[in-house]
């Protein structure tokens, strides 16, 4: 197959030689000849093959190869006895033209196989080339990646090693296709990574891209987009610039970029000529972008000339290199008379000084008299030539150990062995490096150089002139000094923005639009949610609340009424005063235990009633106390029991009065169970009913504590007893029944003045109690969402219930005992039974005898006679 391809190349070569015009070639004689391929001219327009002379990337790089060859040939330690020659061609910055030129490199190989044997034509004769040049040992070049790719595809057929000094396409690292290619520069994916890191450094997440057609631009921008996606950077629009685009076409590209106003940053992976035209179109349209450009732009003045305003603020990348002072001296001393070996130098001279040798006005000029800017890749050209020389030197030492001349083993040079065994394994200190620089020339297993880039910004200096300023470098990581960049320095204020959507606030997450990872809507999290990530709000859960940074949750403190709270001070004060008042009443009753008022009130039931009132006041302290299992048990037990003690005693009293006077109306016998012991037993039986209900409640719903959070106030966690408010209502239902019955009896006996009108006062007590309960129960259940209001309502209501008993029932008795003692005496009455009607005889004898008198009593419209003072 390779023989067939070589034969086809031979036919193409003969056609090119027969039909093509005469071309310029730089030839230097030598024992071993190195080919050279340089863009001496820029690419031409549609009607011409080549354009103007390319001073920096063409002439300077070509002269750098000649400079390196001169130094090598004079070096007694590198290839001594072997002289290196050159066969240098012009690529005109076009891959097709370069491929035509590169056929010169393989002409000498077309008549021989890889093993040196001569090719045999189909008719049996040997293939011959009458004007075949010296065989090319290796090639230095080309510059552009698409040129190197085309040439590499040709050279590999003839096993000719190739070392490029500027081609950075990632495709060239594929050793299955470019197995004789190496380069002293790193591949573009390092540069693409550096550019993506620059964008991420400035938080530019939405950018446009422009790439030159061809392998350099297209593969470079593909590598950049891959690195950008890994860093969540999105491309708004991707544009390409062609080889022969008109000014209008470049303006169309700029207008396309302007269609994405949020993408203020444009990433360029273009050749220098395309970058120059794009900047010119931008300036004509008075547009403005922040450019981030590859080494195709680099730090070239020719790119920005005439478009300085459009280029201002750009960030560009250039392979890290250092100027070679010896080359600067060499180049500045050149002129057309001492550099006749370079056939393009006279043309360069005329364009550089705008003179003409026909008019003899070029002799007065000198390169030493004009500013000199050394092209940034001169170092890589020199390193490429030295790498080939070191590889040949090592090969010579291995194959020709006994001579400094070429031996038969290197006639011709085996290109496969030269590349595999010597070029890829070469390692030496870079020539002409500064003393403080540690620069080693070597290749990795893909034939690539080591990656390090300098980063520049194009700025306007204080004198109004524009210049490139180095602001950092990239070597497996980004280092930037933003204080040098005018728009990024601290004094500049806000950085230029290039993003599709504004950053979300701390309490918001991104709702990404389909297909646009850089475009989103900001959705606020709920107050009880934290940010699980930048796209998700997560519920903290009941009892937890997001921290200040919304990165997690913390457990909310448990809230309950504390003794020092305003919500506790009022109820506790009322309870304390009520308890003291109860103890005072108890003390007065005990002190006057044998007096008629106390005896007539039913001492045993009064003491039980005072105990219930005191328990009502004590319940305030239990409800204010911090909830615990014991406290919750006491709450359940104490609340219903306190009420049942009070209302059981009152019910027993009113029931007794009702039965007594009910029997008197009907003339019945003395009612049963009206003795003190019976009354206490009835009261205790009624209380035990409440105790049984509470006991069942405690069994069915075990007491304990729980955390409660209202849906509308999740930031508040209340420490509460675990019983339900409905179950509390069930416990109080029994007391409601007692109150209803007690109120009924109080109403029935309201006109009975027995025992100092006690029935009337019991009625007042029950009426007021009903009002309190009718107000308390709705408030208690309506305020269930606010534990403080509910607890305070409960405490005040319970205390009021006790206070009503004290005020309405005991206060009148206390008033008689303390302030009307004359009423607190025994009244003598006739020994007539309470349950018999007063006889006329007794009435006639009223006031006679022993002084006893009958006191008529009217109860509910019936007159009865009471012969006793004490009810018990």
Curated annotation (Swiss-Prot):
Swiss-Prot/TrEMBL keywords: Cell membrane, Cell projection, Disulfide bond, G-protein coupled receptor, Glycoprotein, Membrane, Receptor, Signal, Synapse, Transducer, Transmembrane, Transmembrane helix
Localization of this protein: Cell membrane; Synapse; Cell projection, Dendrite
Residues that bind L-glutamate: 57, 61, 145, 166, 168, 295, 377
Signal peptide: 1-18
Assembly and oligomerization: Forms heterodimers with GRM3 or GRM4. Interacts with GNAI1. Interacts with TAMALIN. Interacts with HTR2A.
GO cellular component, one term: astrocyte projection
Protein name: Metabotropic glutamate receptor 2
Keyword Transmembrane included in the entry's annotation: yes
InterPro entries: ANF_lig-bd_rcpt (IPR001828), GPCR_3 (IPR000337), GPCR_3_9-Cys_dom (IPR011500), GPCR_3_9-Cys_sf (IPR038550), GPCR_3_C (IPR017978), GPCR_3_CS (IPR017979), GPCR_3_mGluR2 (IPR001458), GPCR_3_mtglu_rcpt (IPR000162)
Expression sites (tissue/organ): Detected in neurons in brain cortex (at protein level).
Gene3D superfamilies: 3.40.50.2300, GPCR, family 3, nine cysteines domain (2.10.50.30)
Side of membrane Extracellular, spans: 19-568, 626-633, 701-726, 782-798
Chief location category: membrane
Region Important for interaction with HTR2A, annotated ranges: 677-685
Family: Belongs to the G-protein coupled receptor 3 family.
Residues bearing glycans: 203, 286, 338, 402, 547
